[in-house]
Design a protein with these regions (language model features):
Chain B
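N-terminal, post-signal-peptide region of Sec/Tat-exported proteins
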Residues: 45-47
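Alpha-helical scaffold repeats of the Armadillo/HEAT/TPR superfamily
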Residues: 142, 174-181
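Structural detector for internal amphipathic alpha-helices that build alpha-solenoid repeat scaffolds
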Residues: 2-13, 23, 30-43, 52-53, ...
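Short amphipathic alpha-helical segments that mediate assembly, nucleic-acid/protein binding
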Residues: 18-21
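Generic anion/oxyanion-binding catalytic loop in active/binding sites
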Residues: 25, 86, 181
Length: 129, 202
């Protein structure tokens, strides 16, 4: 197992089972995982703590993932520079384009395999696979 | 000490009359449209006014005020105005529509069976989130029926997410059948196992 023990990942998704699934995949590889239930809670967390990566769903109550991204990218560095991996069931080109315009580093369509998620987390955390 | 004359009270800003509210809602500034949206529910023709305003509105906070006004009306008809926005290409609009429908569970429930059978998988998925605010027995029944016929793994996952909270022993059979139908989806296997464990432990 590679050592990602100092890499902190924020998972923002309103689905508890999804958060648990991602946490399980990432913690098994040594990532430190924090969770947020929507974009608003995610913003509060990134303003208070340092993260190496945010994994963000699109459709969430109160603040969606695209609005979260727009807001994040409007902040000062280093907060605005956090890599963001968008995950969504919205597989249309329109949603991918919206995520890219908002500043997403990559877009994965659900359902996602744990290995795939961990692999992309390693890439965006700058860790060797 | 000299007497200080108390200044005359400033004249109160007159409350806009019904016609003004209707005009403000469509033609006013951002602030006026926002204010009008909150007052429109008092008018007898609120529903057509809010319907038109929502279709034209481009400012997010005003749009949210209109969604809130429609949710406050809480009728099946006002829910019907919101529902098409679940199909929006704009994630913020979908979220606002979903939040509004979740704030009017009784009215949204009338449309839920149809939404759970919608041709668009993304609409069915959002409908599962609306089911979450219904009484647990109603939500479980609707979602069990959905899972039995659903072919999209993401929609099943959204239904299972809610069933993990609302489901009973009666849900276990449907969950087991779902696992058999999607043997190649590791997330669904994980979600079903977790949901079954949670239901079983209650």
């Amino acid at each position: 197992m590679s050592d990602y023990s100092k890499k902190r990942v924020l998972v923002i998704d309103d689905a508890a089972l999804v958060r648990t699934y991602y946490r399980s995949a990432l913690e098994a590889r040594g990532f430190v995982v924090e969770e947020a239930l929507n974009g608003l809670e995610g913003l509060e967390k990134v303003l208070l703590q340092a993260f190496d990566l945010a994994i963000v769903d699109v459709n969430m109550p109160q603040m969606d993932g695209i609005t979260f991204l727009h807001t994040l990218r409007s902040k000062e560095l280093p907060i605005s520079g956090i890599p963001v991996l968008v995950t969504s069931t919205e597989s249309g080109m329109q949603d991918m384009a919206a995520a890219r315009r908002a500043g997403a580093n990559y877009y994965l369509v659900k359902p996602i395999k744990q290995e795939t998620l961990a692999e992309y987390a390693a890439i965006f955390c700058g860790a060797a696979r | 000490m000299p007497l200080i004359r108390k200044p005359a009270s400033p004249p109160e800003t007159p409350a806009p009359d019904d016609r003004n509210i209707a005009e403000m809602l469509i033609e006013g500034s951002d602030d006026e449209r926002w204010t009008a949206a909150r007052r429109t529910t008092l008018l007898p023709e609120a529903l057509p006014l809010l319907t038109t305003a929502l279709s034209k509105e481009r400012i997010a906070r005003v749009r949210e005020a209109i969604f809130t006004a429609l949710a406050k009306m809480g009728s099946s008809e006002s829910a019907a105005v919101i529902i098409p926005y679940l199909r929006s290409d704009d994630a913020a609009q979908r979220t606002a529509a979903l939040d509004a429908l979740r704030a009017m569970p009784g009215a949204a429930a009338v449309h839920l069976p149809g939404l759970l059978k919608d041709a668009d998988a993304d609409v069915r998925l959002l409908a599962c989130e609306i089911a979450r605010v219904l009484p647990a027995d109603d939500a479980s029944r609707l979602l069990e029926e959905l899972i039995e016929r659903e072919l999209n793994p993401n929609v099943c996952a959204a239904a299972i997410e809610v069933l993990a909270e609302t489901g009973t022993a009666a849900s276990l059979k449907v969950l087991g059948q779902c696992a058999t139908r999607f043997p190649e989806e590791p997330f669904l296997a994980f979600a079903i196992k977790t949901a079954r464990d949670r239901i079983g432990s209650r």
